Amino acid sequence: MNAGREEIRALAHSLVKNTNGQVDDESFNHIGLTINGVTVELHSTPGFMANFVYNRRLQKWLKRNVDAQCGNMVELVHGDGTVAVPTPSFNCVYQLYHLYHHYFYEGVGLRQVVDYFFVVRKWNVDCEKLSSLQRELKLLGLWRFAGAM
């Protein structure tokens, strides 16, 4: 769903009303809910950075990529429907950003490192993709952090 903060808030309240759930917390970029014992986060933006310049670049990068990500549909097993999943190149950049965010704001756990490991491992990098990836990471201020990982 490509929606603004108010639309996300309305969706959250609608979901909890229809499922006897509850709204747990709200932060700058998400609203947390519990539905049938399952914790869910609805994001108005997938991420943000404290540095004004890099945050602006990140928001533009996310907007440029939203259609490709929302349109990348994958069939679930047993014919249970389809879901949108990130493209491999987007996922590689986003998971590194996510790891970066945890490093500076919430603490990094093995979970975030393993998530990034599997994304990078699955994404067979050829020279053309590597060049594009390097450009995006430099643009977003993540290139040196990538070197540390």
Give, region by region, the residue ranges found by the protein language model.
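Conserved NTP-donor binding/palm subdomain of two-metal-ion nucleotidyltransferases/polymerases, i.e.
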Residues: 3-149
